[in-house]
Amino acid sequence: LFDGLYISGNKEICDEYMGKYPVIFLSLKDVDGLKYENAKYRIMELIGREAERYFFLGDSDRLSENEKEQYKAVIALQNGKYSMDENVLTSSLRLLSHLLFQHYGEKTVILIDEYDVPLDKAFQNGYYQEMVSLIRGLFGMALKTNDSLQFAVLTGCLRISKESIFTGFNNFEVLSVLNVPYDESFGFTDNEVEKLLDDYTFSDHYPEVKEWYDGYHFGNTDIYCPWDVIRYCKSLCADL
């Protein structure tokens, strides 16, 4: 999958992390709804589908019968829809991480992308307090004092106050685009843009790309928007 890419050349990182831990991944970008119940169901659906990727847990000889029943409660359907009640939903990520730890003997990594979208949509549609309560419970159960958790990474655009949904979290670190150690991680650097243009024999277009798309300064680094640069290169290819 990563042959020829930069990450494949970093042997230490690959040896330490690649394929070593079970992973729970959720993207909350599509969690929306005019009413709380609609948005809550979208979260339920995402977690249910993620749990179904590990369908073998239902028959794992490393889980107790009670644990298998708990897993089945997360993926259970009623009239074709996931049927978790709010208590099961709130504990679902913690439970799934525990079951994966029991099955694999390795702690679980949890990755949650655009964690802030449900809260933003809830604020716009008038059910913010209900969504904050759900997210606080869901994240709190999964990420706080969870012995089955290796680590978790949450990404988002909005800075949600720690007091609203991350109350009492241990070893919680906020990293923004202003943090120097990660300032090259949120877009294309100048060197990467130069190499991209060179690979497509468009090096003579570098001055205009820099003028148009060199739009951000993160930490100590000038950063280009990847989408804009790629679209520009695509338009140049179309003109050949």
Can you say where each PLM-predicted feature lies in the sequence?
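Short secondary-structure boundary/capping segments
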Residues: 40-43, 124-130, 164-179, 233-240
